Amino acid sequence: MKEIPRQARNDKQGLKTLIMAEHNDLGKLGEQLARDFLIAKGYQILEQNWSCGHKEIDIIAMDGNELVIVEVKTRRVTFLVDPEETVDKIKQRFLIWAAESYVERNNLDVDVRFDIVAIVVDKNNEHRIDHIENAFYPMLSRRR
């Protein structure tokens, strides 16, 4: 973790800005690690940080004939929960909705899979990558 300047320690907004910058840097690192990891496994990367409205898909890839929607979660070792545990039902719905938009916009006729790439980074920037294939499935909507 970066050293926090003395002035920022006494300035709540400055501290918040530094923490967000660290968080964003960690997220970018995680997405690059995930991309490299998937390419090494033979995936074809189609999109990175694809957005539709205010929803974003971290990585869209092809694994054979299957379209893979990948949510990348990167955390420092100090977090109490594993990164993949932070992909809740709301986030899953957003990803499903965005994936449907991507498939429709690109007129694709493919099976879609939702994966999570969870990355834990230690203080020396060493990392562990867990790839959870079929991490969740689209839910049927309830009609009344």
Region annotations inferred by a language model:
Residues 105-144:
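Domain-level recognition of nuclease-like catalytic cores that cleave nucleotide substrates
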Residues 52-55, 125:
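Short acidic/glycine-enriched loop/turn segments that link adjacent beta-strands
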Residues 38, 57-79, 83, 87, ...:
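Conserved catalytic cores of phosphodiester-cleaving nucleases, focusing on short active-site segments
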